[in-house]
């Protein structure tokens, strides 16, 4: 392989470190911060040169998709058994708040827990309306994107007021009931709502 400049070596080393410790590569912004480059275009330029020299391969449709081709980097560190799941802005599980539909970060999950055919995202929960289902304030729910739900499913739903909430879904005669799992709270009754996905798991940090 063609010899790298000092800066290119710094960037490659940082990408390797992030893949080893987190299971997925860093963003362009994170690379810039790590090596002291304020311009994202400069970082992109260095990545392009690393790619042209055969050290990495990128997927232009995915901002963090960087595969390390360096022969010295063990294949075991490529974490083929891990999938990077996007973390979307917070959604409430108490009083609904307007959904923030932007990716804040990525989180590595074992592929055995998430089918590669599923489109999955994670959301941080705020509030205590789902505590009796074991979903607590500050938890991250793992959500499979889908537009329909069966009665009793725990879903992320967007109401007619364009607010998102985590609730148990029930379609009844002339309305939809979004039922909290907290006996102190009343259900949300709406004529219609948009299902953003079904909750298939919960991730919690124990302090």
From Swiss-Prot:
SUPFAM superfamilies: LexA/Signal peptidase, Winged helix' DNA-binding domain
EC number per UniProt: 3.4.21.88
Active site: residue positions: 129, 167
Catalysed reactions listed for this entry: Hydrolysis of Ala-|-Gly bond in repressor LexA
Marked site positions, Cleavage: 93-94
Swiss-Prot/TrEMBL keywords: Autocatalytic cleavage, DNA damage, DNA repair, DNA replication, DNA-binding, Hydrolase, Repressor, SOS response, Transcription, Transcription regulation
One of the GO biological process terms: negative regulation of DNA-templated transcription
InterPro entries: ArsR-like_HTH, LexA, LexA-like, LexA/Signal_pep-like_sf, LexA_DNA-bd_dom, LexA_repressor, Peptidase_S24_LexA, Peptidase_S24_S26A/B/C
Gene3D superfamilies, per the entry: Umud Fragment, subunit A, Winged helix-like DNA-binding domain superfamily/Winged helix DNA-binding domain
Gene Ontology terms, MF aspect: DNA binding; serine-type endopeptidase activity
Record-linked NCBIfam families: lexA
Task of the protein: Represses a number of genes involved in the response to DNA damage (SOS response), including recA and lexA. In the presence of single-stranded DNA, RecA interacts with LexA causing an autocatalytic cleavage which disrupts the DNA-binding part of LexA, leading to derepression of the SOS regulon and eventually DNA repair.
Assembly behavior: Homodimer.
Protein name: LexA repressor
Designated gene of the protein: lexA
């Amino acid at each position: 392989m063609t010899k790298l400049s000092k800066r290119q070596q710094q960037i490659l080393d940082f990408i390797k470190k992030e893949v080893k410790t987190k299971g997925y590569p860093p963003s362009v912004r994170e690379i810039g911060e790590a090596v002291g480059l304020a311009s994202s275009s400069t970082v992109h330029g260095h990545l392009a040169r690393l790619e042209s020299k055969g050290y990495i391969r990128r997927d232009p449709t995915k901002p963090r998709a960087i595969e390390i081709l360096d022969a010295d980097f063990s294949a075991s560190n490529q974490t083929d058994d891990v999938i990077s799941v996007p973390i979307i802005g917070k959604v409430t599980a108490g009083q609904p708040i307007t959904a923030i539909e932007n990716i804040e970060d990525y989180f590595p999950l074992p592929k055995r827990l998430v089918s590669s055919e599923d489109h999955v995202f994670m959301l941080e929960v705020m509030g205590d309306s789902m505590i009796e289902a074991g979903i607590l304030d500050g938890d991250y729910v793992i959500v499979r994107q889908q537009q329909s739900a069966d009665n009793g499913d725990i879903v992320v739903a967007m109401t007619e007021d364009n607010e998102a909430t985590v609730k148990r879904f029930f379609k009844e005669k002339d309305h939809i009931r979004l039922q909290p799992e907290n006996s102190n709270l009343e259900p949300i009754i709406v004529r219609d709502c948009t299902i953003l996905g079904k909750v298939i798991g919960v991730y919690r940090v124990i302090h």
